[in-house]
Amino acid sequence: MGKFLIKGGNPLKGKIKVSGAKNAALPIITAALLADTPSKLIDIPHLRDVTNLCNILEKMGAGVEFENNIVSIDPTTLTEAEADPELARKLRASYYILGVLLAKEGWARTSLPGGCNIGNRPIDLHLKGFKALGADVKLDHGIVEVKANKLKGARIYLDYPSVGATINIMLAATRAEGKTVIENAAREPEIVDLANYLTVMGAKIKGVGTDIIKIEGVDSLKGAEHRIIPDRIEAGTYMIAAALNKGDVFVDNVLAEHLKSLIAKLKEMGIQIKEEISGIKVVSNDKLKAVDVKTLPYPGFPTDLQSQIMVLLTQAEGTSLVIETVWENRFMHVDELKRMGADIKIDGHSALIKPSQLTGAEVTATDLRAGAALILAGLVAEGETEVRNINHVERGYEDIEEKLSGIGADIRKVK
């Protein structure tokens, strides 16, 4: 299982490099199966989720090579349209197989996916989209099966701008007959990145990055080479780490336009932010101001940075308010932060944070971003912090201990 041991108080200085975006890599790797020829995908992070997905595709017969952050995929050897149920349960993104193989093979089956336990995350919107395109959908004892003789374009309104549903419907629609319109679509940069890859493959997609996406189906797609965008959540995590620890850190390989909401909040707290071509320089201030944060779908403040900024707010002067509107179980890290001395009160979907002197403690990561928050808390806490269940963290952060050590953090992984 492993754990991180962290001694707090070290100022962070230097340069830290951000990896490719996991949440872009997973749908793009799966989308490579849509093509009739191989693809080469660059800047893919070495993470457990990525490895699990590659293993799923290999078991389905696809040719997959993963080394030096490059994934090469040959879809021509694909023999199965069903994902291994044990592997699929470990990975929420395994549901993208449904949209891809429904479009290409007319049939797909997988078990209901896993991932972080941060609340009710149904795939109803995905299935509603598939049905609108003409698919038959069966859900039985945790197994999802989709079938269609020929998908036909449709106008689909999403009750909520779900990232997963937007991606899955877009994947299925690329090879459907006619035009598909997705209304109230999610606008995340990872969706734009996927659409850019699909377009190079020969797909006809317009409006990505807005709430209305239009897809004109094509008969076939060809493989392509594509470089994944930087991981904005990893970048945001390191920006917050720098702000916590009297930092003077250059966060390399960041697209600042993907982090406007975080940058605005950090500046509001009194932190110096300088946007450069290849990254963002963060210089901390001894006195941080309290701010209010409300999570929203992109381009609002990301729910995936809520737990991390909550740690930063414990070091601010004054009372801060955090309102979580995206996931209902996204405060699971709070009890662990309280073990370290954090003064946080929860009321429904809101958290009230007061200034706190954090001290080292034994804490447990309950999910990916909670784990990241506990690491950040350990970096600023007095004494030693032990973070357990780090398998959650390793699902989403490539070489996090080496990267943080490189800018002065005292962090090491032990068995």
Swiss-Prot record:
Similarity comment text for this entry: Belongs to the EPSP synthase family. MurA subfamily.
Recorded name of the encoding gene: murA
GO biological process: cell division; cell wall organization; peptidoglycan biosynthetic process; regulation of cell shape; UDP-N-acetylgalactosamine biosynthetic process
HAMAP family (UniProt xref): MurA
One Pfam family cited in the UniProt record for this chain: EPSP_synthase
Residue sites binding phosphoenolpyruvate per the record: K22, N23
Record's keyword annotation contains Chaperone: no
Annotated function: Cell wall formation. Adds enolpyruvyl to UDP-N-acetylglucosamine.
Binding-site residues for UDP-N-acetyl-alpha-D-glucosamine, renumbered to this chain: R92, R121, P122, I123, D124, L125, D304, V326
Name of the protein in its database record: UDP-N-acetylglucosamine 1-carboxyvinyltransferase
Domain of life: Bacteria
Active site: C116
Listed PANTHER family: UDP-N-ACETYLGLUCOSAMINE 1-CARBOXYVINYLTRANSFERASE
Molecular functions (GO terms): UDP-N-acetylglucosamine 1-carboxyvinyltransferase activity
Enzyme Commission code: 2.5.1.7
